[in-house]
Protein backbone atom coordinates (compact mmCIF):
# COMPACT_ATOMS: atom_id res chain seq x y z
CA UNK A 1 0.00 0.00 0.00
CA UNK A 2 1.31 3.45 -0.82
CA UNK A 3 0.93 6.05 1.94
CA UNK A 4 0.52 8.79 -0.69
CA UNK A 5 -2.86 7.55 -1.92
CA UNK A 6 -6.13 6.34 -0.42
CA UNK A 7 -6.43 2.60 -0.81
CA UNK A 8 -9.44 0.31 -0.94
CA UNK A 9 -8.85 -2.93 0.91
CA UNK A 10 -11.40 -5.59 0.03
CA UNK A 11 -11.61 -8.37 2.57
CA UNK A 12 -13.32 -11.64 1.79
CA UNK A 13 -14.31 -13.12 5.12
CA UNK A 14 -15.18 -16.80 4.95
CA UNK A 15 -17.91 -16.81 7.63
CA UNK A 16 -21.29 -16.29 5.92
CA UNK A 17 -19.72 -15.00 2.70
CA UNK A 18 -19.39 -11.51 4.07
CA UNK A 19 -17.92 -8.79 1.90
CA UNK A 20 -16.61 -5.64 3.49
CA UNK A 21 -15.15 -2.65 1.70
CA UNK A 22 -12.88 -0.64 3.95
CA UNK A 23 -11.69 2.73 2.84
CA UNK A 24 -8.45 3.12 4.74
CA UNK A 25 -6.66 6.45 4.83
CA UNK A 26 -3.00 6.72 3.90
CA UNK A 27 -1.81 7.12 7.45
CA UNK A 28 -3.81 4.18 8.79
CA UNK A 29 -2.69 1.85 6.02
CA UNK A 30 0.92 2.79 6.58
CA UNK A 31 0.66 2.21 10.34
CA UNK A 32 -0.99 -1.18 9.79
CA UNK A 33 1.77 -2.11 7.33
CA UNK A 34 4.53 -1.01 9.69
CA UNK A 35 3.02 -2.70 12.75
CA UNK A 36 2.55 -6.02 10.97
CA UNK A 37 6.10 -5.90 9.62
CA UNK A 38 7.46 -5.54 13.12
CA UNK A 39 5.56 -8.52 14.50
CA UNK A 40 5.35 -11.08 11.72
CA UNK A 41 7.15 -12.55 8.72
CA UNK A 42 8.13 -9.92 6.11
CA UNK A 43 6.61 -11.90 3.24
CA UNK A 44 3.46 -13.60 4.54
CA UNK A 45 1.61 -12.17 7.50
CA UNK A 46 -1.38 -13.73 9.24
CA UNK A 47 -3.38 -11.15 11.19
CA UNK A 48 -4.82 -12.14 14.59
CA UNK A 49 -8.49 -13.03 14.86
CA UNK A 50 -10.24 -10.06 16.44
CA UNK A 51 -13.89 -8.91 16.63
CA UNK A 52 -14.74 -6.21 14.12
CA UNK A 53 -17.47 -3.83 15.32
CA UNK A 54 -18.65 -2.54 11.97
CA UNK A 55 -21.59 -0.57 13.33
CA UNK A 56 -19.34 1.77 15.32
CA UNK A 57 -16.82 2.41 12.56
CA UNK A 58 -17.54 5.62 10.66
CA UNK A 59 -15.55 4.66 7.58
CA UNK A 60 -16.79 1.06 7.25
CA UNK A 61 -19.95 -0.03 5.44
CA UNK A 62 -21.42 -2.89 7.50
CA UNK A 63 -23.04 -5.68 5.50
CA UNK A 64 -23.10 -8.31 8.25
CA UNK A 65 -22.05 -7.69 11.86
CA UNK A 66 -21.23 -11.34 12.57
CA UNK A 67 -17.79 -11.32 10.95
CA UNK A 68 -14.97 -12.39 13.32
CA UNK A 69 -12.69 -14.53 11.08
CA UNK A 70 -8.96 -13.98 10.54
CA UNK A 71 -7.36 -12.84 7.30
CA UNK A 72 -4.04 -13.31 5.52
CA UNK A 73 -2.23 -10.38 3.90
CA UNK A 74 0.64 -10.84 1.48
CA UNK A 75 3.10 -7.96 1.83
CA UNK A 76 6.28 -7.06 0.00
CA UNK A 77 9.72 -7.19 1.58
CA UNK A 78 10.47 -4.39 4.07
CA UNK A 79 12.16 -1.34 2.63
CA UNK A 80 14.95 -0.91 5.16
CA UNK A 81 18.14 -2.92 4.69
CA UNK A 82 19.82 -5.13 7.27
CA UNK A 83 23.21 -6.90 7.19
CA UNK A 84 23.00 -10.50 5.98
CA UNK A 85 25.38 -13.44 5.92
CA UNK A 86 28.24 -13.02 3.46
CA UNK A 87 28.20 -14.90 0.19
CA UNK A 88 30.36 -18.01 0.13
CA UNK A 89 34.08 -17.74 -0.53
CA UNK A 90 37.44 -18.10 1.14
CA UNK A 91 39.66 -15.69 -0.75
CA UNK A 92 39.60 -12.28 -2.42
CA UNK A 93 40.29 -11.83 -6.12
CA UNK A 94 40.87 -8.85 -8.35
CA UNK A 95 37.44 -7.60 -9.37
CA UNK A 96 37.82 -4.22 -11.06
CA UNK A 97 40.19 -1.37 -11.85
CA UNK A 98 38.93 2.17 -12.36
CA UNK A 99 41.91 4.06 -13.81
CA UNK A 100 40.45 7.29 -15.25
CA UNK A 101 43.72 8.83 -16.37
CA UNK A 102 44.39 6.04 -18.86
CA UNK A 103 41.92 8.17 -20.84
CA UNK A 104 43.77 11.39 -20.09
CA UNK A 105 44.09 12.32 -23.76
CA UNK A 106 40.34 13.01 -23.83
CA UNK A 107 39.15 16.57 -23.59
CA UNK A 108 35.87 18.31 -22.86
CA UNK A 109 33.06 16.31 -21.27
CA UNK A 110 34.95 13.02 -21.72
CA UNK A 111 37.94 14.20 -19.70
CA UNK A 112 38.54 12.36 -16.40
CA UNK A 113 38.03 14.39 -13.25
CA UNK A 114 40.93 15.00 -10.90
CA UNK A 115 39.92 13.18 -7.71
CA UNK A 116 41.14 11.78 -4.42
CA UNK A 117 39.67 9.93 -1.42
CA UNK A 118 37.55 7.50 -3.49
CA UNK A 119 35.17 5.10 -1.76
CA UNK A 120 32.25 2.86 -2.72
CA UNK A 121 28.82 2.46 -1.15
CA UNK A 122 26.02 0.12 -2.23
CA UNK A 123 22.24 0.05 -2.09
CA UNK A 124 19.96 -2.90 -2.85
CA UNK A 125 20.14 -2.33 -6.61
CA UNK A 126 23.34 -0.43 -7.36
CA UNK A 127 26.75 0.61 -6.09
CA UNK A 128 28.15 4.10 -6.48
CA UNK A 129 31.79 5.08 -6.77
CA UNK A 130 32.32 8.29 -4.81
CA UNK A 131 35.28 10.66 -4.69
CA UNK A 132 36.26 14.22 -3.83
CA UNK A 133 37.09 16.23 -6.95
CA UNK A 134 39.00 19.49 -7.26
CA UNK A 135 36.50 20.70 -9.88
CA UNK A 136 39.14 20.16 -12.53
CA UNK A 137 39.84 17.64 -15.26
CA UNK A 138 42.91 16.20 -16.97
CA UNK A 139 44.01 17.47 -19.41
CA UNK A 140 43.22 21.01 -18.42
CA UNK A 141 44.58 24.26 -17.10
CA UNK A 142 43.55 24.02 -13.46
CA UNK A 143 46.15 21.71 -11.96
CA UNK A 144 47.38 24.21 -9.37
CA UNK A 145 46.07 23.27 -5.93
CA UNK A 146 44.99 19.73 -6.78
CA UNK A 147 47.34 18.36 -4.12
CA UNK A 148 45.57 20.34 -1.39
CA UNK A 149 43.30 18.52 1.06
CA UNK A 150 40.87 21.40 1.53
CA UNK A 151 39.79 24.30 -0.63
CA UNK A 152 36.62 26.03 -1.83
CA UNK A 153 36.43 24.08 -5.09
CA UNK A 154 36.29 20.50 -3.83
CA UNK A 155 33.02 18.57 -4.29
CA UNK A 156 31.64 15.14 -3.48
CA UNK A 157 30.86 13.37 -6.76
CA UNK A 158 29.74 9.90 -7.78
CA UNK A 159 29.30 7.64 -10.77
CA UNK A 160 27.68 4.25 -11.06
CA UNK A 161 30.31 1.66 -10.14
CA UNK A 162 32.04 0.59 -13.34
CA UNK A 163 31.73 3.99 -15.00
CA UNK A 164 34.75 6.25 -15.41
CA UNK A 165 34.42 9.48 -13.35
CA UNK A 166 34.54 11.89 -16.25
CA UNK A 167 32.96 15.33 -16.49
CA UNK A 168 29.86 13.99 -18.26
CA UNK A 169 29.45 10.80 -16.19
CA UNK A 170 29.75 12.37 -12.75
CA UNK A 171 26.98 13.62 -10.48
CA UNK A 172 28.04 16.52 -8.26
CA UNK A 173 26.30 16.10 -4.89
CA UNK A 174 27.62 18.98 -2.80
CA UNK A 175 30.61 21.16 -2.03
CA UNK A 176 32.86 19.08 0.24
CA UNK A 177 36.48 18.35 1.09
CA UNK A 178 35.53 15.36 3.27
CA UNK A 179 32.71 12.94 2.59
CA UNK A 180 30.68 9.80 3.14
CA UNK A 181 27.50 8.19 1.79
CA UNK A 182 25.25 5.20 2.43
CA UNK A 183 21.91 3.69 1.36
CA UNK A 184 19.24 2.74 3.92
CA UNK A 185 17.30 0.52 1.50
CA UNK A 186 14.96 3.33 0.54
CA UNK A 187 17.19 6.27 -0.37
CA UNK A 188 20.76 7.56 -0.47
CA UNK A 189 22.22 9.65 2.33
CA UNK A 190 25.12 11.89 1.26
CA UNK A 191 27.52 13.57 3.69
CA UNK A 192 29.81 16.47 2.87
CA UNK A 193 32.08 18.62 5.02
CA UNK A 194 33.52 21.98 4.03
CA UNK A 195 34.18 25.43 5.39
CA UNK A 196 37.17 27.04 7.11
CA UNK A 197 39.38 24.82 9.27
CA UNK A 198 38.26 26.61 12.42
CA UNK A 199 34.53 26.34 11.73
CA UNK A 200 33.79 23.52 9.28
CA UNK A 201 30.26 22.26 8.72
CA UNK A 202 28.80 18.81 8.05
CA UNK A 203 25.97 18.88 5.50
CA UNK A 204 23.51 16.04 4.94
CA UNK A 205 21.55 15.36 1.77
CA UNK A 206 18.80 12.71 1.59
CA UNK A 207 17.94 11.87 -1.99
CA UNK A 208 17.79 15.26 -3.68
CA UNK A 209 16.98 17.30 -0.56
CA UNK A 210 19.51 19.00 1.71
CA UNK A 211 18.19 18.06 5.13
CA UNK A 212 20.50 18.81 8.09
CA UNK A 213 23.84 20.19 9.31
CA UNK A 214 26.25 19.65 12.20
CA UNK A 215 28.75 22.25 13.39
CA UNK A 216 32.37 21.95 14.48
CA UNK A 217 32.80 21.07 18.16
CA UNK A 218 36.58 21.47 18.53
CA UNK A 219 37.15 24.14 15.86
CA UNK A 220 39.97 22.14 14.30
CA UNK A 221 39.06 20.59 10.92
CA UNK A 222 35.79 18.78 11.58
CA UNK A 223 35.90 15.81 9.20
CA UNK A 224 34.31 12.45 8.46
CA UNK A 225 35.40 8.96 7.49
CA UNK A 226 36.05 9.03 3.68
CA UNK A 227 34.18 5.74 3.29
CA UNK A 228 30.62 4.46 3.50
CA UNK A 229 28.43 5.06 6.54
CA UNK A 230 26.37 2.08 7.74
CA UNK A 231 22.57 1.65 7.85
CA UNK A 232 20.29 -0.80 9.64
CA UNK A 233 16.51 -0.61 9.90
CA UNK A 234 16.46 2.94 8.55
CA UNK A 235 19.11 4.26 10.96
CA UNK A 236 22.48 5.26 9.49
CA UNK A 237 25.62 5.67 11.59
CA UNK A 238 28.36 8.13 10.61
CA UNK A 239 31.77 8.57 12.25
CA UNK A 240 33.11 12.13 12.59
CA UNK A 241 36.09 13.68 14.37
CA UNK A 242 37.38 17.15 15.19
CA UNK A 243 40.81 18.02 16.51
CA UNK A 244 44.51 18.31 15.82
CA UNK A 245 46.18 16.06 13.25
CA UNK A 246 49.12 15.82 15.66
CA UNK A 247 47.32 15.79 19.00
CA UNK A 248 43.91 15.14 20.51
CA UNK A 249 41.07 14.43 18.08
CA UNK A 250 38.04 12.82 19.70
CA UNK A 251 35.50 11.17 17.45
CA UNK A 252 31.72 10.98 17.67
CA UNK A 253 29.05 9.05 15.83
CA UNK A 254 25.92 10.62 14.39
CA UNK A 255 22.76 8.54 14.13
CA UNK A 256 20.87 9.73 11.06
CA UNK A 257 17.39 8.78 9.91
CA UNK A 258 15.98 9.91 6.57
CA UNK A 259 18.61 12.61 6.35
CA UNK A 260 18.19 14.07 9.83
CA UNK A 261 20.41 13.67 12.89
CA UNK A 262 18.45 12.02 15.69
CA UNK A 263 21.26 11.25 18.16
CA UNK A 264 24.91 11.93 18.98
CA UNK A 265 27.01 9.05 20.34
CA UNK A 266 30.12 9.81 22.41
CA UNK A 267 32.52 6.84 22.56
CA UNK A 268 34.29 5.86 25.76
CA UNK A 269 37.63 4.15 26.28
CA UNK A 270 40.82 5.02 24.43
CA UNK A 271 39.57 8.22 22.80
CA UNK A 272 42.72 10.37 22.38
CA UNK A 273 42.82 10.28 18.59
CA UNK A 274 40.41 8.54 16.21
CA UNK A 275 39.84 9.48 12.59
CA UNK A 276 39.09 8.09 9.11
CA UNK A 277 37.33 4.99 10.40
CA UNK A 278 36.36 2.19 8.02
CA UNK A 279 33.22 0.62 9.48
CA UNK A 280 30.95 -2.36 8.89
CA UNK A 281 28.51 -4.72 10.57
CA UNK A 282 29.91 -7.60 12.59
CA UNK A 283 26.28 -8.59 13.30
CA UNK A 284 22.80 -7.07 13.43
CA UNK A 285 23.78 -5.69 16.82
CA UNK A 286 27.33 -4.39 16.37
CA UNK A 287 29.17 -2.04 14.04
CA UNK A 288 32.96 -2.36 14.16
CA UNK A 289 35.47 0.17 12.82
CA UNK A 290 39.21 0.07 12.16
CA UNK A 291 40.45 3.65 12.38
CA UNK A 292 43.52 5.87 12.10
CA UNK A 293 45.52 7.45 14.92
CA UNK A 294 47.62 10.15 13.30
CA UNK A 295 49.32 11.24 16.51
CA UNK A 296 50.35 8.53 18.95
CA UNK A 297 50.50 4.99 17.57
CA UNK A 298 50.79 2.75 14.52
CA UNK A 299 48.13 0.47 15.97
CA UNK A 300 44.60 0.99 14.74
CA UNK A 301 41.97 2.28 17.16
CA UNK A 302 39.13 -0.25 16.97
CA UNK A 303 35.54 0.81 17.66
CA UNK A 304 32.62 -1.37 18.75
CA UNK A 305 29.25 0.38 18.46
CA UNK A 306 26.13 -1.30 19.83
CA UNK A 307 23.16 -0.25 17.67
CA UNK A 308 20.66 -1.50 20.27
CA UNK A 309 21.96 0.74 23.05
CA UNK A 310 23.66 3.39 20.86
CA UNK A 311 26.86 3.15 22.87
CA UNK A 312 30.42 2.90 21.56
CA UNK A 313 33.81 2.00 23.01
CA UNK A 314 37.30 2.36 21.52
CA UNK A 315 40.44 0.36 22.27
CA UNK A 316 43.62 -0.26 20.31
CA UNK A 317 43.95 -3.41 18.24
CA UNK A 318 46.19 -5.85 20.10
CA UNK A 319 47.57 -7.78 17.12
CA UNK A 320 51.32 -7.74 16.57
CA UNK A 321 50.57 -6.99 12.90
CA UNK A 322 50.53 -3.19 12.94
CA UNK A 323 48.31 -1.82 10.21
CA UNK A 324 49.16 1.89 9.94
CA UNK A 325 51.87 3.58 7.86
CA UNK A 326 54.49 4.54 8.98
CA UNK A 327 54.92 1.73 11.52
CA UNK A 328 57.60 -0.15 13.47
CA UNK A 329 58.52 -3.79 12.91
CA UNK A 330 55.70 -6.22 13.63
CA UNK A 331 55.77 -7.46 17.21
CA UNK A 332 58.24 -4.81 18.39
CA UNK A 333 55.83 -2.92 20.67
CA UNK A 334 56.08 -4.27 24.21
CA UNK A 335 53.68 -4.00 27.10
CA UNK A 336 49.90 -4.33 27.27
CA UNK A 337 47.56 -4.00 24.30
CA UNK A 338 47.03 -0.30 25.00
CA UNK A 339 50.75 0.52 24.60
CA UNK A 340 51.30 3.06 21.82
CA UNK A 341 54.87 2.12 20.90
CA UNK A 342 56.91 4.36 18.64
CA UNK A 343 56.57 5.67 15.07
CA UNK A 344 53.04 6.76 15.82
CA UNK A 345 53.15 10.12 14.08
CA UNK A 346 51.41 10.21 10.70
CA UNK A 347 49.08 7.61 9.29
CA UNK A 348 46.79 6.37 6.54
CA UNK A 349 43.18 5.24 6.21
CA UNK A 350 42.97 1.44 6.21
CA UNK A 351 40.71 -1.11 4.53
CA UNK A 352 38.50 -3.30 6.71
CA UNK A 353 35.49 -5.51 5.94
CA UNK A 354 33.60 -8.35 7.61
CA UNK A 355 32.89 -11.84 6.33
CA UNK A 356 29.79 -12.91 8.26
CA UNK A 357 29.30 -16.69 8.37
CA UNK A 358 26.83 -18.90 10.22
CA UNK A 359 29.43 -20.32 12.60
CA UNK A 360 32.22 -17.72 12.63
CA UNK A 361 33.27 -14.27 11.47
CA UNK A 362 36.21 -13.19 9.33
CA UNK A 363 37.78 -9.76 9.57
CA UNK A 364 39.78 -8.70 6.50
CA UNK A 365 42.29 -5.83 6.64
CA UNK A 366 44.64 -4.09 4.22
CA UNK A 367 47.95 -2.33 4.82
CA UNK A 368 50.74 -0.92 2.69
CA UNK A 369 53.63 -3.26 1.89
CA UNK A 370 56.12 -0.51 2.74
CA UNK A 371 56.52 0.32 6.43
CA UNK A 372 57.38 3.94 5.70
CA UNK A 373 55.87 4.91 2.35
CA UNK A 374 52.46 4.70 0.71
CA UNK A 375 53.53 1.94 -1.64
CA UNK A 376 51.99 -1.47 -2.25
CA UNK A 377 48.97 -3.02 -0.52
CA UNK A 378 48.61 -6.43 1.10
CA UNK A 379 45.53 -8.27 2.39
CA UNK A 380 45.25 -9.91 5.83
CA UNK A 381 42.57 -11.95 7.61
CA UNK A 382 41.72 -13.12 11.13
CA UNK A 383 38.82 -15.45 11.92
CA UNK A 384 36.88 -15.06 15.16
CA UNK A 385 38.53 -13.73 18.30
CA UNK A 386 38.47 -10.21 19.68
CA UNK A 387 40.62 -7.50 18.04
CA UNK A 388 40.91 -5.77 21.44
CA UNK A 389 42.63 -8.71 23.12
CA UNK A 390 44.07 -11.04 20.44
CA UNK A 391 47.82 -10.45 20.17
CA UNK A 392 48.41 -13.06 17.47
CA UNK A 393 49.62 -12.00 14.04
CA UNK A 394 47.10 -11.59 11.25
CA UNK A 395 47.34 -14.10 8.39
CA UNK A 396 48.62 -12.65 5.08
CA UNK A 397 46.24 -13.44 2.24
CA UNK A 398 47.87 -11.97 -0.86
CA UNK A 399 49.32 -8.92 -2.58
CA UNK A 400 46.79 -6.55 -4.14
CA UNK A 401 49.26 -3.82 -5.13
CA UNK A 402 52.99 -4.44 -5.53
CA UNK A 403 55.72 -2.35 -3.93
CA UNK A 404 56.27 -0.67 -7.31
CA UNK A 405 52.77 0.86 -7.33
CA UNK A 406 51.17 3.47 -5.06
CA UNK A 407 48.94 2.27 -2.24
CA UNK A 408 47.28 5.13 -0.39
CA UNK A 409 43.90 5.08 1.36
CA UNK A 410 41.91 1.83 1.41
CA UNK A 411 38.35 1.11 2.46
CA UNK A 412 35.76 -1.65 2.77
CA UNK A 413 32.26 -2.06 1.35
CA UNK A 414 29.70 -4.77 0.61
CA UNK A 415 27.84 -5.53 -2.62
CA UNK A 416 24.30 -6.84 -2.15
CA UNK A 417 23.56 -10.08 -3.97
CA UNK A 418 20.03 -11.52 -3.99
CA UNK A 419 20.40 -13.47 -0.75
CA UNK A 420 23.80 -12.53 0.68
CA UNK A 421 26.38 -9.73 0.87
CA UNK A 422 29.75 -9.74 -0.92
CA UNK A 423 32.60 -8.18 1.11
CA UNK A 424 35.10 -6.08 -0.87
CA UNK A 425 38.11 -3.86 -0.28
CA UNK A 426 39.00 -0.86 -2.42
CA UNK A 427 42.43 0.77 -2.77
CA UNK A 428 43.25 4.34 -3.72
CA UNK A 429 46.24 4.37 -6.09
CA UNK A 430 47.40 7.99 -6.25
CA UNK A 431 49.24 9.60 -9.13
CA UNK A 432 51.32 12.04 -7.10
CA UNK A 433 52.26 14.93 -9.33
CA UNK A 434 53.44 17.09 -6.47
CA UNK A 435 52.53 20.76 -6.54
CA UNK A 436 53.56 21.37 -10.15
CA UNK A 437 51.06 19.22 -12.04
CA UNK A 438 47.86 17.24 -11.52
CA UNK A 439 47.38 14.98 -8.51
CA UNK A 440 44.69 12.30 -8.81
CA UNK A 441 43.85 8.64 -8.21
CA UNK A 442 42.78 5.29 -9.61
CA UNK A 443 40.75 2.73 -7.63
CA UNK A 444 41.49 -1.01 -7.42
CA UNK A 445 38.76 -3.34 -6.12
CA UNK A 446 39.12 -6.83 -4.65
CA UNK A 447 36.14 -8.95 -3.57
CA UNK A 448 35.48 -12.27 -1.86
CA UNK A 449 34.92 -14.94 -4.50
CA UNK A 450 35.71 -18.63 -4.76
CA UNK A 451 38.61 -20.40 -3.12
CA UNK A 452 42.36 -20.76 -3.53
CA UNK A 453 44.84 -17.88 -3.39
CA UNK A 454 44.67 -14.25 -4.43
CA UNK A 455 46.25 -14.46 -7.87
CA UNK A 456 47.13 -11.07 -9.30
CA UNK A 457 48.03 -7.55 -8.24
CA UNK A 458 46.84 -4.31 -9.83
CA UNK A 459 48.70 -1.60 -11.77
CA UNK A 460 47.27 1.78 -12.80
CA UNK A 461 48.92 1.76 -16.22
CA UNK A 462 49.34 5.54 -16.05
CA UNK A 463 52.51 7.39 -17.04
CA UNK A 464 52.25 10.99 -15.84
CA UNK A 465 54.97 12.03 -18.28
CA UNK A 466 52.75 11.33 -21.28
UniProtKB/Swiss-Prot annotation:
The ranges of region (Head of neuraminidase) come to 89-466
Q: Which regions face the Virion surface side of the membrane?
A: 32-466
- Where is this protein localized, as stated in its record? Virion membrane; Host apical cell membrane
Q: Which residues bind substrate?
A: 116, 150, 275-276, 292, 374
Q: Where does Ca(2+) bind?
A: 293, 324
* Swiss-Prot/TrEMBL keywords: Calcium, Disulfide bond, Glycoprotein, Glycosidase, Host cell membrane, Host membrane, Hydrolase, Membrane, Metal-binding, Signal-anchor, Transmembrane, Transmembrane helix, Virion
Q: Where is this region: Involved in apical transport and lipid raft association?
A: 13-35
This protein's GO CC annotations: host cell plasma membrane; membrane; virion membrane
Q: Which reaction does it catalyse?
A: Hydrolysis of alpha-(2->3)-, alpha-(2->6)-, alpha-(2->8)- glycosidic linkages of terminal sialic acid residues in oligosaccharides, glycoproteins, glycolipids, colominic acid and synthetic substrates
Q: What is its EC number?
A: 3.2.1.18
Cofactor(s) recorded for this entry are: Ca(2+)
Further comment found in the protein's record: The influenza B genome consist of 8 RNA segments. Genetic variation of hemagglutinin and/or neuraminidase genes results in the emergence of new influenza strains. The mechanism of variation can be the result of point mutations or the result of genetic reassortment between segments of two different strains.
**Similarity comment: family membership:** Belongs to the glycosyl hydrolase 34 family.
Full protein name: Neuraminidase
Organism per entry: Influenza B virus (strain B/Yamagata/16/1988)
Amino acid sequence: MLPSTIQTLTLFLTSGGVLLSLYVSASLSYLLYSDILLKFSPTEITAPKVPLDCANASNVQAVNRSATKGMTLLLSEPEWTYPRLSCQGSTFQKALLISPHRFGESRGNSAPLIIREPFIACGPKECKHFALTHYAAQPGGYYNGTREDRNKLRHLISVKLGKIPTVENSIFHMAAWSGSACHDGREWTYIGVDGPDSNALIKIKYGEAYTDTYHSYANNILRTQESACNCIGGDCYLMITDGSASGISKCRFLKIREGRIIKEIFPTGRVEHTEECTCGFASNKTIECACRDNSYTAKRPFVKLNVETDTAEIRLMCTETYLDTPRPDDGSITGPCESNGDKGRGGIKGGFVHQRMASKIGRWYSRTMSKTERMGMELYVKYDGDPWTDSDALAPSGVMVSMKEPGWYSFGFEIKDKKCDVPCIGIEMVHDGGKKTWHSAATAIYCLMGSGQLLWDTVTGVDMAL
